[in-house]
Amino acid sequence: MPKLKTNKGAAKRFKKTASGGYKCKHSHLRHILTKKSTSRKRSLRAPDSIEKVDIPMVRKMLPYS
């Protein structure tokens, strides 16, 4: 059986947690930041977690994580 390929785009975006979940970065924090409130930008800094329904898809893209 051949080795499975890791999806490199997913590898750069998702990190596996110790409990088996995946974390990623929030979106909407790259540009057009002047109209966004400080509290909104601060909350976007914290890591986001992947929804439970999306975990099988992420696992398929990251077979060795």
UniProtKB/Swiss-Prot annotation:
Per the record, its GO cellular-component terms are:
cytosolic large ribosomal subunit
Give the residue ranges for region: Disordered.
1-21
Tell me where on the tree of life, at the top rank, the source sits. Bacteria
Set out the biological process GO terms recorded for this chain's protein.
translation
Spell out where the chain crosses the membrane: none
Database matches in Gene3D superfamilies? 4.10.410.60
The record ties this protein, via InterPro entries, to: Ribosomal_bL35, Ribosomal_bL35-like, Ribosomal_bL35_CS, Ribosomal_bL35_sf
Q: Which UniProt keywords apply?
A: Ribonucleoprotein, Ribosomal protein
In alphabetical order, the GO MF annotations are:
structural constituent of ribosome
Protein family: Belongs to the bacterial ribosomal protein bL35 family.
Q: What is this protein called?
A: Large ribosomal subunit protein bL35
Q: What is the lineage of its organism?
A: Bacteria, Pseudomonadati, Pseudomonadota, Gammaproteobacteria, Candidatus Pseudothioglobaceae
